[in-house]
């Protein structure tokens, strides 16, 4: 389930990048 972690990191990056 590494792809799930990658997707979560992308979503988190959007929030942290805001």
UniProtKB/Swiss-Prot annotation:
The keyword Ligase does not apply. GO terms for biological process: killing of cells of another organism. One of its GO terms (cellular component) is extracellular region. It comes from the Bacteria. GO terms for molecular function: toxin activity. The modification N-formylmethionine is found at residue 1. Coiled coil: none annotated. The keyword Secreted applies. Keywords: Cytolysis, Formylation, Hemolysis, Secreted, Toxin, Virulence. It is found in: Secreted. Virulence factor. Causes hemolysis of erythrocytes from sheep (HD(50)=4.79 mM), rabbit (HD(50)=8.76 mM), guinea pig (HD(50)=2.00 mM), dog (HD(50)=5.35 mM) and human (HD(50)=6.34 mM). Acts synergistically with beta-hemolysins from S.aureus ATCC 25923. Cytotoxic towards human dermal fibroblasts. This is Hemolysin H2C. It comes from Staphylococcus cohnii subsp. cohnii.
